[in-house]
């Protein structure tokens, strides 16, 4: 079975669009782009367009690749103080000379719709309400719920320990709640006995950032696999590349119980959760 993200995302977005249509003023989403990374340009354009399509007011704030930390913090401060802005995200990756932690911490936690501020991360880890969950982990759980993949008591192997996906996702899956409450193993590319552990997992979430890392020999026939990875691999097609995930899809798809494709799996869910967080932020400010 293919766990396609597009129909799930469309359902989430349609609900948000209907709710926005009844609001007195539009939610505002500010997207900060530093530099001119081609992939980042595409992602920013996609997020701004999606927000606009839903009835939000969204704008990309572009700064050059040699922008200083002071320049960026001044922009973020202005956006923090702008009452028409309800969500702020800084597109990553950032140029290497910049301190990403300082930039993320400068965003008001109440407007941190990417869910990466230490305050929101802390609330997530403690199971406290009122914060924003990171978009990709939230999207993964929404995807699993849509396809009625049970999590309660199941062994979930998360491969990847990033602050954006692996760590927060593990924390969310472990929450003592009927919709999650999974048994989680957090792995990475250097974990010992990786293959043996993965073969015991009911659900594998691949977020290691290495193309085709998860092979057919590493998964069982009962495994449900969520592929978070997105990498460009050079080819001779018109684009000059194809997008592949962290899972060797062509060989794994015929063995596992279910798998999310790349593209069209987790990607649409990440954008949908960003819009959901922005709408929820607007509602909090409005109340």
UniProtKB/Swiss-Prot annotation:
CDD domains listed in its UniProt record: NAD_bind_m-THF_DH_Cyclohyd
Short name of one Pfam family: THF_DHG_CYH
Record: residues binding NADP(+): 160-162, 189, 230
Family matches, as InterPro entries: Aminoacid_DH-like_N_sf (IPR046346), NAD(P)-bd_dom_sf (IPR036291), THF_DH/CycHdrlase (IPR000672), THF_DH/CycHdrlase_cat_dom (IPR020630), THF_DH/CycHdrlase_CS (IPR020867), THF_DH/CycHdrlase_NAD-bd_dom (IPR020631)
Top-level division of the source organism's lineage: Bacteria
Entry-linked PROSITE patterns: THF_DHG_CYH_2 (PS00767)
Gene Ontology process terms (BP): L-histidine biosynthetic process; methionine biosynthetic process; purine nucleotide biosynthetic process; tetrahydrofolate interconversion
EC number: 1.5.1.5, 3.5.4.9
GO cellular component: cytosol
NCBIfam families to which the protein is assigned, alphabetical: PRK14181.1 (NF010778)
Self-association state and partner proteins as the record states: Homodimer.
Role played: Catalyzes the oxidation of 5,10-methylenetetrahydrofolate to 5,10-methenyltetrahydrofolate and then the hydrolysis of 5,10-methenyltetrahydrofolate to 10-formyltetrahydrofolate.
Family listed: Belongs to the tetrahydrofolate dehydrogenase/cyclohydrolase family.
Protein name as annotated: Bifunctional protein FolD
């Amino acid at each position: 079975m293919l766990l396609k993200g597009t129909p799930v995302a469309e359902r989430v977005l349609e609900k948000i669009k209907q709710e926005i249509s009844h609001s007195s003023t539009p939610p505002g989403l500010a997207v900060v782009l530093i530099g001119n990374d081609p992939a980042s340009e595409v992602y920013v354009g996609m997020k701004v367009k999606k927000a606009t399509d839903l009835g939000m007011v969204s704008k990309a704030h572009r700064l050059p690749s040699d922008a200083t930390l002071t320049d960026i913090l001044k922009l973020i401060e202005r956006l923090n103080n702008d009452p028409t802005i309800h969500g702020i995200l800084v597109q990553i990756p950032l140029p290497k000379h910049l301190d990403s932690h300082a930039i993320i911490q400068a965003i008001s936690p109440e407007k941190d719709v990417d869910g990466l501020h230490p305050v929101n991360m802390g609330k997530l880890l403690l199971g406290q309400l009122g914060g924003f969950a990171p978009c990709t982990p939230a999207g993964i759980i929404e995807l699993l719920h849509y396809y009625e993949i049970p999590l309660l008591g199941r062994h979930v192997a998360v491969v990847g320990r990033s602050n954006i996906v692996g760590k927060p996702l593990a924390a969310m899956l472990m929450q003592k709640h009927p919709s999650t409450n999974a048994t989680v193993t957090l792995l990475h590319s250097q974990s010992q006995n990786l293959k043996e552990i993965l073969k015991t997992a009911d659900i594998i979430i691949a977020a290691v950032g290495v193309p085709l890392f998860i092979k057919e020999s590493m998964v069982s026939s009962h495994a449900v696999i969520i592929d978070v990875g997105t990498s460009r691999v050079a080819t001779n097609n018109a684009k000059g590349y194809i997008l592949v995930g962290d899972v060797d899809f062509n060989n794994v798809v015929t063995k596992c119980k279910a798998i999310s494709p790349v593209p069209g799996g987790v990607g649409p869910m990440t954008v949908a959760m960003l819009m959901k967080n922005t709408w929820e932020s607007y509602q909090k400010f409005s109340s």
